[in-house]
Amino acid sequence: MEKVLRDYRSRLQANSRETERIKMYIRIIAFLRLSVVVVAALIVYLFRNEGVEVWGTTVLIGIVLFLSLARVHDRWFRKKEFVDCRDRIIHRELSLLEYRFDGIDGGSEFIDPSHDYSFDLDLFGERSFFSYINRTATAVGRVALSRELLHPDLKTASIRERQEAVEEKSCHTDFRIDFQSYGGCSGESRVDTEAIERLAGMPRFGTGRIVCWLVYAVPAVYLALFALWLTGMVAGNVIVAVFILLLVLSGLFAKRVTRIQEQLNRTLQSLSRYSRLFEMMERMRFRCKPLSELQSRCVDSDGSVSQRVSRLRHLLSNLDQRYNFVGFALLNGFLLWDLRQINALDRWLCDNCEKITQWIDVLSRFDVYVSLGTFRYNYPDYVFPDIREDRTPVMQAEALGHPLIPREKRVCNDVAPMNEASFQIITGANMAGKSTFLRTIGINYLLGCMGAPVCADSMTFTPLPLFTGLRASDSLADNESYFFAELKRLQQIVLRLRRGEKLFIILDEILRGTNSVDKQTGSLALIRQLVGAGATGIIATHDLALGKLADSLPGKVSNYRFEAAIQGDELTFSYRLQPGIAENMNACFLMKKMGIIPSDYSENN
């Protein structure tokens, strides 16, 4: 960890030096631009009586120099934008390594209380696991990462391939930071893939064959007219008339062009900004299969994706010139600019529209690997779990910890082998660590399914669908009580098991909404049914009677506990998992200490 922190701090210092260098060049170029204006104005003033050849040439040279310097100035400003983005990226890494989540995106729109596990494991929201792991550079990558968290591919071969890709991307630190920085420079606009797919089926919006022919004939017409004018065969008024005629023709199409431009900007503007990201993907050399396959999808017989997306960006930028009134008049009067660009965009879409969805899929998948590669790099002591297919075990780990708990506060525990059709029952006092332990298992199991490293010394697991029941809530909108909401989740588990699914189940204090006897009877019956259906999992409870199942279901149910120690007036927790059934409870002790009940209260009072 210290090595990683030193690396980021070193990069931050180097980036600061580069920022200062770029600022210096920007100031120099600004001074040169001003100097060109001042010198040109001075020469014009001093030689104003020398004839139009002298001061006219000076003005022309001054304009060329000024515009050239403006282009150079713009490039340096883009470089500064890039290094500023890189500065923010590195600062974000340092903040997250120190578990500071202020201002970090939590993906709140992905929160779904009905999902199999995401709500229980706090995957999304403020200070969530998504905040911790998300390093995506694009809006489409961000959505793809949420899909990976919610619906990971559980095929063993796929997980192993993802592990290879994550490991390889963890070695490309410069690439990852630059990729994220260019993504940050491209903006956060959402790429509407559904709208893009609809573009493929929309009618062509080109201007027709006659107007298209006219667009390409206009430059030749003007050249001929200018040549005739220079020889005195045509009056200048003819050229002016043609200019006005073409301007009127452009005006007739202006409303249609504006409508098409707005539609294309909504659907394609974000994609056009990603040309540099595609270029980075295409130029890198990859060893592992997943990254190589993604890269191969960026090139075909028609050229590379980056070239075609760059062409799109160029066309959209050209069309934006129409918003300048002078530019609109000159460009359309001489070149029928709007119609020329609309026809070019129509041809571009005709050639590429059906491929855009594939490009976005490639970019989003690659972005997820960059994100997980950063996670791997940031935590070099995390390990890739071993994957089993025979469910022996479904889950086992040594020194398993919760990645969202800082290292100095984290207490790691071993997880005994959980084989098929077996359950571990965790008993313990309030605040002893049961719920945190369940979430620790859930988060690391999910990381393993995603192909990411886990917070453990070692871990072995069989990828199965994960289902949790750690929290439930009343729903006034659905006229649903807490207890009924919990029953519905338990019903989902049972129905899926009856359909033959194999699940990894994590439950916390089931049937909390009923009386003790009813709860105990229902809990015992549920665990027997889950074991009988071949499910595997872990259940935390305060009900010590559930521990007796280990006697009636030997080899199928095992007991573990978190203990609280009461020494005099102090309550302490070790947060260490131990075999057996809990012996100490702390509710009355805490109620006495907080003055809720009398300090001399006892059950005999």
Which residue stretches match the model-derived regions?
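ATPase nucleotide-binding head domains, primarily ABC-like/P-loop NTPase cores
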Residues: 70, 372, 379-605
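Alpha-helical coupling/stalk and coiled-coil linker elements that connect catalytic or binding modules
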Residues: 1-429, 436-466, 488-489
